[in-house]
Amino acid sequence: MDTQTTTKTKPLGLGLNDDYPAICIQDYETNNFQWFNVYEIFQNSDDLHEFKCFMNKARESVITSVSSEWFYPDCQYLHSIYSEHIDDSELYDYCESLEDALADGHSVSLHEEFIGALGTEYFGMLSDMYYGEFDNTKEFAEHHIEETEDLDSIPWIIRSNIDYSNVWYDLQDDFIEIEADRSNYFFKR
């Protein structure tokens, strides 16, 4: 008697990793859902087309019938671009931007907060706009003024009375503060 075995392989990216962007895919009819590590899918894709194919396989692994509909009920590290039917192209662009940020030593959460504050038109620009990390706006303002102005030409009595907390308010048109990882990061606008 011959027996037949079939092996069902898990789709790429199945599971949740606390350190990287993930999305939950849910079947409308059955409420069956699975979490997928979007960044893992991106890293294993050669291009946008392959990424879309992997995402389709992920969705197909969750839905129960051809007529079933799916949606994304939740996400992790994707709130800046989240919608229930976010486009695969936007997910891919987000992951490309994240890859650039990680390569330059920035964190996943800083990238997420950066995109959340400035928008998708700033994909890939985190490192170009990055100015530095400071404890607070006063420290940032003092550092910036010391780097850009010739304070030695100003009499000490005036220099010692500069209120750097107020200087920050004048710098807000040129810089933005973003909080992530329990730190304050500053970016040029």
Language-model segments: which ranges?
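Acidic interaction surfaces
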Residues: 1-189
